[in-house]
């Protein structure tokens, strides 16, 4: 073989390797853009107008919260009670609150009563969500889960995923019991044939185990905050982790996930828990958690610097109030979205 053929062969070999490597890299590092409560930094949270905004921006997943009304209807709202910082009475007056500043419990209100609140006129935090870019939409109502699924039917080619957080609290039983709560949500999912287009997440891991027993097809995400994993004492585990004692099983995020692997598929932590340089780091890297079979989708990341840092760690997705910023980062560094 003469020198020219050797050089040609070598060039083709290198080019093939580069192309293969690039394809592999793109497949490995594609990122799921999850709009937190729709696009909370740009529009009222957990509203149809906010979800539509997120879809128009190109999210691959809508992340939102669900409660259940007095008449058993799953509605999309973050808190167990009507939040006076987010909603107004229909006449524009402030929400009536109790001595602790809470509005009426979702579970004590019918859907008709829920629909009477204006949840589009207020910005709950002008410092965190400056205007612009955020816009208010007066008279926007709290949507039902069914109404969101009907909105998604208008985008049949987008295959928008839903990340549904169930808002139950083991320390504050202000909702339906977990079985009734979960059953109401599952019924709407099944009615709309969306079991293969949703996952359900919760800080309250007991409800995740219940859902897995009822509908094993649905992917489940274990949420963990910077304190929810901590045991009460040496003999009493955190009430959030379904009986798993963080310190006793090994004291790392991967250790508690291994204890719950029968029903948890996705680890969804506060981003600080998976950042090795942060003092809240729980001892398991993104790669270690993924190698054990779990996807990693942290929350809530609103700065492009942290977005890029977590992308470099290899996370599967990012939950953000500003999906437009995440999309910008992905495009800037030529990283495909899922």
Give the ranges of each region predicted by the language model:
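Intrinsically disordered, low-complexity segments
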Residues: 2, 19-20
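Phosphate-group recognition and catalysis centered on beta-loop-alpha active-site segments
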Residues: 23-338
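Bacterial N-terminal signal peptides that target proteins for export
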Residues: 1-10
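Bacterial N-terminal signal peptides
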Residues: 9-19
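Hydrophobic alpha-helical segments, especially transmembrane helices
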Residues: 6, 17, 37-38
């Amino acid at each position: 073989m003469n020198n020219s053929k050797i050089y040609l062969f070598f060039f083709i070999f290198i080019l093939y390797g580069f192309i293969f490597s690039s394809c592999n890299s793109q497949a490995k590092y594609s990122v799921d853009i999850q709009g937190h409560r729709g696009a909370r930094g740009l529009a009222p949270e957990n509203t149809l107008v906010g979800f539509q905004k997120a879809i128009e921006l190109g999210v691959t997943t809508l992340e939102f919260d669900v409660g259940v009304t007095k008449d058993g209807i799953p509605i999309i709202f973050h808190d167990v009670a009507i939040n006076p910082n987010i909603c107004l009475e229909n006449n524009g007056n402030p929400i009536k609150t109790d001595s602790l500043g809470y509005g009426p419990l979702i579970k004590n209100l019918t859907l008709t009563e829920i629909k009477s609140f204006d949840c589009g006129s207020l910005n709950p935090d002008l410092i965190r969500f400056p205007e612009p870019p955020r816009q208010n939409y007066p008279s926007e109502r709290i949507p039902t889960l069914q109404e969101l699924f009907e909105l998604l039917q208008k985008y049949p080619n987008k295959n928008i995923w839903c990340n549904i957080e169930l808002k139950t609290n083991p320390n504050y039983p202000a909702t339906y019991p977990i079985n009734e709560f979960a059953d109401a949500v599952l019924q709407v999912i099944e009615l709309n044939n969306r079991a293969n287009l949703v996952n359900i997440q919760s800080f309250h891991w007991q409800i995740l185990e219940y859902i897995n027993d009822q509908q094993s097809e649905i992917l489940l995400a274990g949420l963990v905050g910077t304190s929810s994993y901590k045991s009460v004492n040496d003999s009493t585990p955190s009430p959030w982790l379904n009986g798993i004692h963080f310190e006793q099983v090994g004291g790392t995020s991967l250790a508690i996930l291994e204890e719950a692997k029968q029903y948890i598929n996705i680890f969804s932590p506060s981003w600080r828990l998976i950042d090795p340089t942060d003092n809240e780091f729980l001892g398991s890297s993104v790669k270690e958690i993924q190698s054990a079979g779990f996807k990693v989708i942290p929350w809530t990341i609103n700065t492009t610097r942290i977005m890029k840092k977590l992308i470099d760690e290899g996370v599967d997705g990012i939950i953000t109030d500003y999906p437009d910023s995440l999309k910008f980062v992905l495009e800037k560094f030529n990283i495909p979205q899922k």
